[in-house]
Amino acid sequence: GGRYGQKNVILDHISVSWSIDECLSIYKTENLTVQWCLVTHSLNSSVHTKGNHGFGGIWGGYKATFHHNLLANHASRNPRFSSVDGTKWVDYRNNVVYNWGFKTAYGGGHHGEINMVGNYYKPGPASQHHRLLDVAEDGTGRYYVAENVMEGDDTVTYDNHRAVMDRFSCLVDSPFPYEPIEEDIPVVAYHKILKEVGCSFSRDMYDKEVLRQVKKGLGTFGLKGIINSPKEVGGWPVLKVGKPLRDTDADGMPDVWERRYGLNADDASDASTYTLDKNYTNIEIYLNGLLEK
């Protein structure tokens, strides 16, 4: 889960799985983007005090964008939109949801304003219905729902409003303000996401298998794809231990890299300064450069 009250946050190409509650929850933020993240296999019947709790995430914020993410194999909260004051101008677009259990998206109370546009829904073995959204129970949320695709269900694809549980007349006819993205039609987003989502630079065997099952429409792990323990998907891998580069000031940037770019290997404070680029901190430049290797 993300900390509250943060601003100007971006989460990109993250793979996250095996939580005892939500796998990826972030809200009460301002200017947030979550993109190209692979969110899979929360643990349903695990050690949560409330019992079964295999949930995808609580997503929200003020001026928050969620695009090109994949939620797969969660019983519910695919996602849940946060029901707190300030959940406004949330744009949920070009995401893929696969093999939900009893609920896809819901929430957004306390006067939430949410766009759900151009997402791709693929029912799996555990999916109990073809709904897109259950509006918030307090009846104060407002939702623009359009251009979403429900694979295998032309009725829902052609008229999204048929797949919304809305007894409060919460649907609106025009989208709320949002920051534009490089938007795809849903089926194109689906194929792009399967190719690029998560830690795609070097995928582990677990991520590869999850994506294979999404593509094939399978749910062989656990009960129809809903799991209770990491052991059901192979368990924690044994990772090779590498040799870390020397980092004298423990600022996250190796000495050899700092010297190459004219930084001080004995000064930890330069990690958060803008010596190398006016828009990005030095440690961001270092981390982004790792992708070039």
Stretch-by-stretch model annotation:
Residues 4, 17, 27, 85, ...:
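Solvent-exposed, acidic/flexible segments
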Residues 83-231:
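Extracellular beta-rich repeat passengers
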Residues 231-293:
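Extracellular calcium-associated, cysteine-rich motifs in secreted modular proteins
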Residues 36, 67-68, 211, 254, ...:
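Non-transmembrane alpha-helical segments in soluble domains
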Residues 49-51, 268-269:
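Short acidic, glycine/proline-rich loop/turn micro-motifs
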Residues 57, 132-135, 265:
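Short clusters of hydrophobic/aromatic residues that line enzyme substrate/ligand-binding pockets
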Residues 5-18, 30-48, 54-81, 87-102, ...:
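Right-handed parallel beta-helix
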